Amino acid sequence: MPSRLRKTRKLRGHVSHGHGRIGKHRKHPGGRGNAGGMHHHRINFDKYHPGYFGKVGMRHYHLKRNQSFCPTVNLDKLWTLVSEQTRVNAAKNKTGAAPIIDVVRSGYYKVLGKGKLPKQPVIVKAKFFSRRAEEKIKGVGGACVLVA
């Protein structure tokens, strides 16, 4: 049905808008929003929203969450953490300043030694290095920097 034929369009300009005398079509008879969930709307809340009110169980205040959280990245994925432009620049001038790869900024803590590194020096910053990773990074003329 086109909106020009709808009842609301017909009632524009009429104060009561089809609800009788002022005050007859009352404001918010049941309260606004979720009002009365524990009182006059309780039946509806119990039937359609069980468990909406109340608490369950106990809260562990000083819970130690995953003390051994240590996301890892392998050497073969190391160069994917820097931009394409950095990779191209590093490949072009191997004698210039070595690019710095900060794995902590990418969400990793530890560098593991799987895979091969391209034969160009690189400075890697991480919280932990495996022995193999450290050997391989230093083998291509790079450096391992420990960060807190």
Curated annotation (Swiss-Prot):
<feature type="modified residue" description="(3S)-3-hydroxyhistidine">
    <location>
        <position position="39"/>
    </location>
</feature>
<feature type="modified residue" description="N6-acetyllysine">
    <location>
        <position position="110"/>
    </location>
</feature>
<dbReference type="InterPro" id="IPR027386">
    <property type="entry name" value="Rbsml_uL15_N"/>
</dbReference>
<keyword id="KW-0597">Phosphoprotein</keyword>
<feature type="modified residue" description="Phosphoserine">
    <location>
        <position position="68"/>
    </location>
</feature>
<feature type="compositionally biased region" description="Basic residues">
    <location>
        <begin position="1"/>
        <end position="30"/>
    </location>
</feature>
<feature type="modified residue" description="N6-acetyllysine">
    <location>
        <position position="55"/>
    </location>
</feature>
<dbReference type="GO" id="GO:0003735">
    <property type="term" value="F:structural constituent of ribosome"/>
</dbReference>
<comment type="function">
    <text>Component of the large ribosomal subunit. The ribosome is a large ribonucleoprotein complex responsible for the synthesis of proteins in the cell.</text>
</comment>
<dbReference type="GO" id="GO:0006412">
    <property type="term" value="P:translation"/>
</dbReference>
<keyword id="KW-0687">Ribonucleoprotein</keyword>
<comment type="subunit">
    <text>Component of the large ribosomal subunit.</text>
</comment>
<comment type="similarity">
    <text>Belongs to the universal ribosomal protein uL15 family.</text>
</comment>
<dbReference type="InterPro" id="IPR030878">
    <property type="entry name" value="Ribosomal_uL15"/>
</dbReference>
<feature type="modified residue" description="N6-acetyllysine">
    <location>
        <position position="47"/>
    </location>
</feature>
<dbReference type="Pfam" id="PF00828">
    <property type="entry name" value="Ribosomal_L27A"/>
</dbReference>
<dbReference type="GO" id="GO:0022625">
    <property type="term" value="C:cytosolic large ribosomal subunit"/>
</dbReference>
<keyword id="KW-0689">Ribosomal protein</keyword>
<keyword id="KW-0963">Cytoplasm</keyword>
<keyword id="KW-0007">Acetylation</keyword>
<dbReference type="InterPro" id="IPR021131">
    <property type="entry name" value="Ribosomal_uL15/eL18"/>
</dbReference>
<dbReference type="InterPro" id="IPR036227">
    <property type="entry name" value="Ribosomal_uL15/eL18_sf"/>
</dbReference>
<protein>
    <recommendedName>
        <fullName>Large ribosomal subunit protein uL15</fullName>
    </recommendedName>
</protein>
<feature type="region of interest" description="Disordered">
    <location>
        <begin position="1"/>
        <end position="37"/>
    </location>
</feature>
<dbReference type="InterPro" id="IPR001196">
    <property type="entry name" value="Ribosomal_uL15_CS"/>
</dbReference>
<keyword id="KW-0379">Hydroxylation</keyword>
